[in-house]
Amino acid sequence: MQSKRLKNFLVQTKICSSGRKAPQRPILMSTLKVMNIGIVGATGQVGTVMREILTQRNFPIDSIRFFASSRSAGKEIEFQGQSILVEDAATAKWENLDIVLFSAGGQLSKELAPKVASAGAVVIDNSSAWRMDPDVPLVVPEVNAHATKNIPKNIIANPNCTTMVAMPVLKPLHQEAGLRDLIVSTYQATSGAGLAGVQELSEQVREAGEIAIDLTHDGQAIEFPPGNSFPEPIAFNVVPFCGSLIEDELEETNEERKLRDESRKILEIDDLAVTATCVRVPVYTGHSLAITAGFNNPITAQRVKDILSKVPAVVLDDIPTPLKSAGIDPTFVGRIRPDTVLENGINLFLSGDNLRKGAALNAIQIAESLLR
């Protein structure tokens, strides 16, 4: 069950929706109540961004607790003028928390989220552990905030970062013309593989140094340091393999399956046809997607632009890039044009920050939606 504090707060507090960039002013219309918040994985890449966004958005916090693995337990983290001791998630007590944000991997979420939820908190989980559970809503607040009205397990799932980039774009187009097919190629940043992925790219670029130009005529000209995050060198390269291989007749990766299954659940289109190829690229932050979308009803490229120009979570841009989107909340969309293969088809190119809207921001927006 939800804590009494959270139930009372749901009635008494209203929240404004986010703007296009990280807000510089309070978004709360009322601060009659404040919440006890926890972050599991607080010292990690996404947990760090969560801490920043809670401050940027003036989330109503009474107290906050940080949890991490035993390696990070005992450290102190500065937050809004306070020094907060990091607790060991494995041995922590979970009483007197209202909302707990999880970003510590699927295994830990499977183990700890039910314990936290049974102690009275609402869990908002960033891992893949609960996304396809029929009793756990998978939520993008701009798309399906209504799903948070029923949370039988006190757990709400955050979608995969790649799926997230596309949802604010596809939902209004589906409402207009009825989405039928998606053909997607992704260009996923190294930060999607965690801090280790970012470090691996940085080390390989540094190793190449001034002789990187030698790769122009010989792809083996540089012996890169061995890496663990990607199956091939990522510097100056693209790797058409994200995640892990699923051993079935489709021979797809789990990243490709997530895009299909999560899109169907969030958009509530059970028969949506989705095929994807997920590619890792030498970018630090910002996932991009090349999408060909087929619709049940005719829709023009100009109509797509008109619709998306009115969506707060979307920015129209002639040439969307990861560099433009990094550190920014909305999805950048461009290269909008008719497709000549799919019936009623439209081509689009999207870029979005996989750490902000792709993970931390969406989790906090879910928390805000609970307070409406």
Q: Where would I find each of the regions flagged by the language model?
A:
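N-terminal Rossmann-like NAD(P) cofactor-binding subdomain of oxidoreductases
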Residues: 28-234, 272-273, 297, 323-332, ...
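Oxyanion-binding "anion nests"
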Residues: 229-278
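C-terminal active-site/capping subdomain that shapes the small-molecule cofactor and substrate pocket
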Residues: 270-372
